[in-house]
Amino acid sequence: MFDWFKGGKAPQPRKGMPSPRLDEAEFKRRFRSQFQDQAFDPLQEELDRIAHAAWTAYEQSRKSPRTRKAGPGFADPNYDLAVDWIAAHEAVKSAQQRHDDSSNPASILLINGSSRSEHTCPGEMSKSFRLAEIAHEVFASAEGIETNILDLSRLASEYGRKIYPCKACFSTAAALCHWPCSCYPNYSLGQTQDWMNDIYPLWVAAHGIMIITPVNWYHTSSPLKLMIDRLVCADGGNPDPTRTHGKDAVAAKKLELAGWDYPRHLAGRLFSVVVHGDVEGAENVRRSLSDWLRFMRLCPAGPTAELDRYIGYWKPYATSHDELDADTAIQEEVRNAARTLLEGVMAKRSGQFVAAGEELSSPRQK
């Protein structure tokens, strides 16, 4: 507990931003704009009724229309929790049990961070995907390993795949950020088909995570950054939304000020990071990814698990895949990064991996 707080009043949430609420006409215009295909032309009366139903849900702010009582294990068993969140919560719990069960194979999560694929506008696969395939060959050849591939290019090429932006609840108060995230789906705002409830269990079940990404304007790709931001709930997030009565900012501030333990839900997992660029930024992106993972108390598998390189430095984009074909050194470096992660994961599971200081208590949680 902060000495000055001592159970007193929490600061009131600061407000003053303009309202984003729409009137009925504008809401229905935006809602109807998604039905442009001629197949919908004979269905205008039906669409009118559907648009009116959607407007009613929006007007009444029905974020989570289907709920049930939280039940045993929560601070307030009678609180109505969204059934979507309960399902996500159970999936995360199940993933943690798989992670902790030493009789299960070791699990690797291999992430392709590029949004490019031949299945949509770019017309060509990404180099990140090819590098991920090289890494996958290493994992697939090892005994006692299962690999889950998370291809973030699906955000740009697959129907119904979305990752919505983090709403930054953590910046209001740590306890307001729920684990897993409870901000989505928001049915009244049409914020549905969010992928993160499938992604959280992949991270939780993994003993090792390997991220392969290009540099996009001195940063990670936008799909990868969306996932990174939405993983904030894994680093200090509140696993019991009933303690904050849902999204009650004042209640969350009181909880944090009374003393928050910042649970590290992904701590102890090992990671590897491979970043490739064409001109500039690879080192900074690699460093920012590694720093982020370290801050969440994940541990680098070893020096060769972190790699930043340029492919076709200052060469035409049109021939970048040819440059990768010719660069057998980076191909082997990616294999070595995967081998390092694999070796680290197996050593950690057998109790032989030493991460000095891992069990120390930090005087600063934030």
For every predicted segment, state its role.
Residues 206-207:
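An anion/phosphate-binding loop that grips the pyrophosphate of nucleotide cofactors and donors
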Residues 223-238:
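A short, gly/pro- and small-residue-rich
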Residues 236-265:
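Short mixed-charge
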Residues 153-183:
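Charged, often glycine-rich, active-site loop that binds/positions anionic groups
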Residues 106-125:
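Short glycine-rich His-centered loop
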Residues 177-183, 219-226:
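Glycine/threonine-rich flexible loop motifs
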Residues 2-106, 129, 280-283, 287-366:
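Glycine-rich phosphate/pyrophosphate-binding loop and the adjoining helix
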Residues 126-140:
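Short catalytic helix/loop segments, enriched in acidic residues and glycine
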